[in-house]
């Protein structure tokens, strides 16, 4: 979690605490709140990434799922783990979705544009840097 939060500081100006750690206020809730889901992405026995879902909208709509966090650790990128994991998560969680990415994060932009293309997402630019893709995947 810390490495992911550190990496996200390239896109978001989060501050470290005195011990050099970043805090993710809802982390524990992904393991205790029934509305939230955490997925650990493995290749065999090797942890290669994680994803976190919740039902809270970025655009004041009422999604069934929002991709709150998603990462493949840097050493495992460009090996199709992200595409495969995203497809599995989407196919296992049918409904109305929102996925947000930072326009500066070209890897995320490319991934989510590709993965959501079959669902013809509606694109919302919520500010100069952030885009939300809204779609349904009932089929």
Which residues does each predicted region cover?
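Short amphipathic alpha-helix that is part of the acyltransferase structural core
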Residues: 1-22
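A conserved beta-turn-beta hairpin within the catalytic core of GNAT-like acetyltransferases
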Residues: 56-67, 77
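A short, internal acetyl-CoA/4′-phosphopantetheine-binding micro-motif in the GNAT/acyltransferase core
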Residues: 67-78, 101-103
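Conserved beta-strand-loop-alpha-helix junction that forms the acyl-donor binding cleft
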Residues: 98-113, 117, 125-128, 138
